[in-house]
Amino acid sequence: MMAALYPSTDLSGASSSSLPSSPSSSSPNEVMALKDVREVKEENTLNEKLFLLACDKGDYYMVKKILEENSSGDLNINCVDVLGRNAVTITIENENLDILQLLLDYGCQKLMERIQNPEYSTTMDVAPVILAAHRNNYEILTMLLKQDVSLPKPHAVGCECTLCSAKNKKDSLRHSRFRLDIYRCLASPALIMLTEEDPILRAFELSADLKELSLVEVEFRNDYEELARQCKMFAKDLLAQARNSRELEVILNHTSSDEPLDKRGLLEERMNLSRLKLAIKYNQKEFVSQSNCQQFLNTVWFGQMSGYRRKPTCKKIMTVLTVGIFWPVLSLCYLIAPKSQFGRIIHTPFMKFIIHGASYFTFLLLLNLYSLVYNEDKKNTMGPALERIDYLLILWIIGMIWSDIKRLWYEGLEDFLEESRNQLSFVMNSLYLATFALKVVAHNKFHDFADRKDWDAFHPTLVAEGLFAFANVLSYLRLFFMYTTSSILGPLQISMGQMLQDFGKFLGMFLLVLFSFTIGLTQLYDKGYTPKEQKDCVGIFCEQQSNDTFHSFIGTCFALFWYIFSLAHVAIFVTRFSYGEELQSFVGAVIVGTYNVVVVIVLTKLLVAMLHKSFQLIANHEDKEWKFARAKLWLSYFDDKCTLPPPFNIIPSPKTICYMISSLSKWICSHTSKGKVKRQNSLKEWRNLKQKRDENYQKVMCCLVHRYLTSMRQKMQSTDQATVENLNELRQDLSKFRNEIRDLLGFRTSKYAMFYPRN
């Protein structure tokens, strides 16, 4: 069979006379001539080829011998191979530390510059330090950074400087790829640890920049998102190297030079958790949900109530109920003696959470009581006076508004509005303020009695009742944020929030479809609409039928919207019509039928798929998402800005009065000579404490970096799978062993026989 397929080939090898002796002896149709059209003219000498080959194969002794014999300068150390790689680049790709150190010792600093022929390189504009950072090789980067290397600072995507404009005009792809290479280098954990005094802060900033770049340069979105994820994981892994609570306290309380510093808190050695707040601001969910960080947060959260976690469930419930019932007494005790032992217990975040929750439940109880004590005799009063319960509600609302104002003052407008809990609170309080303001206006302006059906549609009392009803709905919905503390209900609450965001995206598509079909149906049925006064209507627009719904834009919108829930029964294709209305009725039926297919079948199922995807995404990372959301809630109770709940927070406390008197006395004394000296001493003490904290932070950070490197090496060595790093390390060891044996025996292997004679 093989002989039949290849008649010119003798499988037995006995005869080869049937083979063609040369292409010229065969027919042109049987032989295809091959020619290398990619041939690159090589300008390297034999010694330069040998030099590059020795660097590629890891032949330390041959590279050393060539460099020692290059006293006359015949060898061009800057030579490159056909791929545009010089000796340093080849060595870094092979991760050969010995040869790299040898090249640097022999003055190859010029090779640290950019490759001269990037057209033949797999990565454009790659300097050796960039290549080493891409490979995340700590040892090679350590050697290269001793040569005073530098990297070009990447410009913003929308930068319109002369340099960026010229590069974009010349080659936009090359410019974008160059920016990606630079950021891939900057995101290297090894480079961050070597060049940054605060690696965690740098990882936060880089992840935020990369996330922003992924939204702008959508062509490289996956690459930038992967780099951002790499930075987040690096910050998390670095924090995981902490061994005790003292190190965690130093890391999480560190304040960078750009952040505002609480001088009083620094002198009193209070926990500000600045780094943790910064992690939440940069949306570092991996960092915040890390086990060490969560353990430290639990310790701070319970404070002097640490024994609560070890109590049985029944005792936990009794503790919460006792605090919830006697919260007014506890608030008064803290108001009178905030620095006492009892006051310190109330000041713990856990106790503040229970007391604030009990205060809010009391507010909801007053709202329910408001509807029960409604006076039926004042039902038709156009301007009723405020009741006692109204004044109680106003006290609570003023307290909640004051709490929001303090939080807005200390956090800033941007950070305040980022929290959906604050947004809901702002809207709720605004509605309550508008409600009681309208009630006061109605009481002062209207004193008559009349049936409600005779009132103006926008009467202040009616508007106030509508706003009050909507505010009540938001008040109860605000309880959803308390679910965050539960490990069971918390993930569900987070999933609901994500689903609402996806539903907002879906509305953008649904409203366009609804508007399109509404315009079509309104245009179709509006022209022949018969007013209701004419009872002798016939055909499609007869009021005995329901087709007159489509005579207005609003009516059509309502009808099509309720079609989704099968609550609109509009007979479009009717049986009783005149001959002239047959086409019009058929077109209406087609439009509504198409609407049912597009919205009821397609878009509704799309919404279900989107919501399922959102829920599954949260469920896959349930632990991380819940711990991050819980940490955000806990942090709002860690400071001492809002210890007392409404309405006790509107009462000036002795602590506030003492702070005001102390600040006033310091301001007065600062204008005297003695006060100026005291102020200088205080500033000096503050600077010394800040310097001491920075030194402690650097010591702890050095320990974390060394532990991180050790864990990475151990992880690489203990892995059971054959990774690229393991194979490269094995290749280097075998190459070193081969070269040492060859040098000891005094000869070269056959691979180098074409370059060296044997000794």
Curated annotation (Swiss-Prot):
GO terms for cellular component: cation channel complex; plasma membrane. Keywords: ANK repeat, Calcium, Calcium channel, Calcium transport, Cell membrane, Ion channel, Ion transport, Membrane, Phosphoprotein, Repeat, Transmembrane, Transmembrane helix, Transport. Residues 1-30 are annotated as: Disordered. Activation of PRKCA induces phosphorylation of TRPC1 and subsequent Ca2+ entry into cells. SUPFAM superfamilies: Ankyrin repeat (SSF48403). One of its GO terms (molecular function) is inositol 1,4,5 trisphosphate binding. Residues 374-381, 483-505, 574-582 are extracellular. ANK repeats lie at residues 46-75, 83-112, 124-153. Residues 1-352, 403-461, 527-552, 604-759 are cytoplasmic. It catalyses: Ca(2+)(in) = Ca(2+)(out). Disulfide bonds: none annotated. The chain crosses the membrane at residues 353-373, 382-402, 462-482, 506-526, 553-573, 583-603. Residues 15-28 have a biased composition (Low complexity). It is a multi-pass membrane protein. It is found in: Cell membrane. One of its GO terms (biological process) is regulation of cytosolic calcium ion concentration. Belongs to the transient receptor (TC 1.A.4) family. STrpC subfamily. TRPC1 sub-subfamily. Forms a receptor-activated non-selective calcium permeant cation channel. Probably is operated by a phosphatidylinositol second messenger system activated by receptor tyrosine kinases or G-protein coupled receptors. Also activated by intracellular calcium store depletion. Homotetramer and heterotetramer with TRPC4 and/or TRPC5. Interacts with TRPC4 and TRPC5. Interacts with ITPR3. Interacts with MX1 and RNF24. Interacts with FKBP4. Interacts with TRPC4AP. Interacts with PLSCR1. Interacts with PKD2L2. Forms a heterotetramer with PKD2 with a 2:2 stoichiometry; has distinct channel properties separate from PKD2 or TRPC1 homomers alone. This is Short transient receptor potential channel 1. It comes from Oryctolagus cuniculus (Rabbit).
